[in-house]
Structures are given as C-alpha cells and as structure tokens.
Amino acid sequence: MNMQETKEISAYKQGLRGKILETAMNAFGEKGIRAVKMDDVAVDLGISKRTLYELYDNKEQLLFEGVKVYNEQRQILIKEKTKNCGNVMEILLTVYRIKVEEFRQTNPLFYADLVKYPKVARFLHQQNQYIHTEMQKFIQRGVSEGFFREDVDEALTMHLFDALGEYVMMNQLYRRYTIEDIFKNIIFVSLRGICTEKGVVALDRIIG
C-alpha cells in the first residue's frame, strides 16, 4: 500500500467517524441514550459492527466524543448569534431562544441518561469552569450597563445558579415542565433578584 492509498483510507475513516457521531447523536437526542444500541447505529449507517467498534470502543466513548463536538458547535453558535447584541439583556434573550429550541428538539430522556456515563459527567463538570468564566463576564458587563445591581456578589450568584441547574437536572423537572416554564419560574425569577429597575423592565420584556 502506497502513501496515497494510506491517506485516502485515513480520510475515509475520519469522514466515517464524523458520520457515526452525527447519526448516533441524532438517535440519542430522539430516543434517549440508553434506548440506542451500538447495533442500531451500525444498521442506520449500513456498516458492520466490526467497523463501528474499530472506530469507537464502546457507546460511552461514542457519546463522549459526540458531546464534545456538540458542545464546541454550541459555543460557536452562541458566539456567532450574540456577537452583534447591544447589551446583556439582548444576549440573554438570544441564549434563551437557543436553549428553548435545543430542548424542544431533544427527548428529555437524553438529559436523564447523560449522568449515567461517568466520563461524560466528568467532562460536563469540567465545562462548568468555562461557563463560570463566561457568567462572571456577563454579570460584570450587566453591572456596567446598569442592568444588574452593583452590590451583587458574583461568587454567591454563581453558586445560586449552579444549585438551581443541579436541582432541575437531579429532579428531572424538564420531564414535567416545559423549558419555557423552567426559565420563567426558576431562572428568571432568581435573575430578577440581581437586577436594577432598568434590568427588571428589560427582563419583563423578555418574559413577556
């Protein structure tokens, strides 16, 4: 086998890995993770189980790689959609719309199943550090723009929203309530507490 043939095989496998990730993540999002077997992914793609296992050792590795790619794509999407926002409240509205659409397209079982895979759970926990950094910038900008109170303790605020997010996930509230209701009755109510009068008016426009 010459070098050109080796490169072609490598490119083919790389392309196939991408197709496998896309197919698997679509299936996980539609049916829940535990409901989808590796065999199902192979059948959907028309490839053998052997080929699939040559590229991904097991379902957790496949899910882990898929979540990483999805997370990167979502960060790019949010940056692209918010780059022209004039203030933090416009950013909040944009991210809210993205999250609502994301939840509408995803089976609640997907979120319930995620925590059952330790490698994925650890990755998501690590991602919280990035989210914390972005949230701190968001709060600081909100203060400078007059939407958030100057006496807000950023560290305590981060702990509050961490606790809220954990409570929603651990109690699977997304299975009983719409994402709109969760945001309006939990997230936005808590956010209102750090808003100035100007911020409350802007937040009410978003909720309304």
Predicted regions, residues:
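Short hydrophobic/aromatic patch on the recognition helix
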Residues: 46-56
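Hydrophobic alpha-helical bundle segments that form small-molecule/ligand-binding pockets
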Residues: 129-157, 161-164, 168, 172
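C-terminal peripheral helix-coil segments that are non-catalytic and often amphipathic
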Residues: 1-4, 137-141, 145, 177-208
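Short secondary-structure transition hinges
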Residues: 100-137, 143-147
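Hydrophobic alpha-helical connector segments
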Residues: 65, 76-105, 158-161
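Basic, helix-initiating cap at the start of DNA-binding domains
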Residues: 1-31, 35-47, 61
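Helix-loop "lid/cap" segments that line or gate small-molecule binding pockets
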Residues: 81, 94-101, 110-113, 189-194
